Amino acid sequence: MELLNEIKFFNRTNKIPSQCLKEAFLNTMLFEETLSENDEPVNSPERVDVLNHINNDDYVRNNYTSFANELMHSRYSSFLTHYAVDEMEKLNIQTFQVPGYEIGFGLKKLPEGIDIVGVHNNTNIKGVGEALIDSAIRLGGTHLDHFDGFLSDFYSKKGFEEYERWKWNDEYAPKGWNYDKYGRPDVILRRLKSFKP
């Protein structure tokens, strides 16, 4: 029965459970860091520059080699789903990178909708996560996944509704998962309320 559920999930989302866990972890870690603006001066020149790029949807697009390198060099690299350059091309993943900064995300076509994937911020610039998600939505993102916790309210306020929830399964835990620090949170799959399949 478990295998049947995994096959059904894969057919519906084009993801395997371990990939979903990795993406959920990264989304959670990104926002744990980027939503906190207390560490970075609100008007630092770098933050203002990054937000100007993001708010104007000004990105380097589809530079797959650079995008793959940024994911590989992320401090959360071991928790990320790494896409090879040829895989990104084959899946037609659209990548968006802030010029001059290792910040970006990808959009991946699903059978129904577009998944926000590979969200990363390899800089020390904080407080840009909300603008990054707003931009991903403007550019067509309709779905995402994350671990249950503080992001649940954030994504609800952004217009994402839960459509599926997985109980934690140790079998799919990312390598090196710190149970003492992160526990065993549910994985929540969300889509925009305005999304119509």
What is the predicted role of each segment?
Residues 147-148:
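Helix N-cap/beta->alpha junction signal
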Residues 14-124, 135-143, 152-158, 165-197:
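Non-catalytic substrate-recognition and accessory regions of acyl/acetyltransferase enzymes
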Residues 1-12:
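Short, intrinsically disordered N-terminal pre-domain segments
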Residues 127-129, 133:
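Extended non-catalytic interaction/regulatory regions in multidomain proteins
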